[in-house]
């Protein structure tokens, strides 16, 4: 198995210890798998554009890039530094930074990780102990670096908890057969991955028997990105499926579990994820295949009672039509996400542990969050 730390880097972040200036480059995922190109992020607008255009994507990575982009903007961008030079009071400095945070939130509305990251950072700099502009900038740069490290360690914990849970039931000597959708690996995070991280941990233990990835139309994150990661990691018995093949595959080939990511998990367990996840969950239920969500603890949004309250981002028509061969002038509906009702979910894997439904089939996400906060 190839070491993912040496093969797949969704971003490159560095801080000069002498000057505290930060630099950031992100892997342009729209060019994969044909071309590997990193793009420099020098300000908040660059970070916003990279997120909005889906040059970077994946709920955990979106949050990380937003925070890192802000750190670079404040510490290294001469235009922003010049604007800060014109501000005298600490309250005005914090207000200036908060405006940039609020702008970053507008880049993509569905993933809660972005909002949580900005809110956490705002609480951090609002501390009365931070009294100067230099302390604000230094605190944000330090927080960005710690967030980057935390994302990788959290992802590895997600993989470990997920593998432990699955192997407690699936005892085939060659391991577990996994199906996944979209991309939830190193390219969707700061490293290792969430749902694909569970498969990676199974592989590390010699207990991944096979992995099937849905292509994930219309952006083909499964065929372009997940298949790329699977091949890089030399995962056993890989197979790529059209989205419409999922039912036939589960019926004729069989699988032990579907493991998917999440952009937001509501208080009742309803989960927003990449479009196509909902239908995969229905198929899995019909076929008696377990269906797990793997996501960071920060994806749990107890402020929303159910999936009916989630704002679903809709992408431009062209993103679908240009890759589908449709006739000119055809209209389409292009939601980026759908919501899987909690009743189709077998469990929610986080770095804190695995949340299972109660005897009546409902999830107590609020209780889980309260217990681990």
Swiss-Prot record:
GO biological process annotation, one example: L-methionine salvage from methylthioadenosine
Keywords of this entry: Amino-acid biosynthesis, Cytoplasm, Isomerase, Methionine biosynthesis, Nucleus
Pathway: Amino-acid biosynthesis; L-methionine biosynthesis via salvage pathway; L-methionine from S-methyl-5-thio-alpha-D-ribose 1-phosphate: step 1/6
Gene3D superfamilies xref list: translation initiation factor eif-2b, domain 1, Translation initiation factor eif-2b, domain 2
Catalytic activity: 5-(methylsulfanyl)-alpha-D-ribose 1-phosphate = 5-(methylsulfanyl)-D-ribulose 1-phosphate
Lipid metabolism as UniProt keyword: no
Transition state stabilizer, annotated site positions: 182
One Pfam family matching this protein: IF-2B
Cellular component terms per the entry's GO annotation: cytoplasm; nucleus
Gene Ontology molecular functions: S-methyl-5-thioribose-1-phosphate isomerase activity
Coiled coil: none
Catalytic residues as annotated in Swiss-Prot or TrEMBL: 263
Subcellular location: Cytoplasm; Nucleus
Top-level taxon of the source organism: Eukaryota
Primary residence: cytoplasm
Signal peptide: none
Amino-acid biosynthesis found in the keyword field: yes
EC number of the protein: 5.3.1.23
Task of the protein: Catalyzes the interconversion of methylthioribose-1-phosphate (MTR-1-P) into methylthioribulose-1-phosphate (MTRu-1-P).
HAMAP family: Salvage_MtnA
Protein name: Methylthioribose-1-phosphate isomerase
Natural source organism: Thalassiosira pseudonana
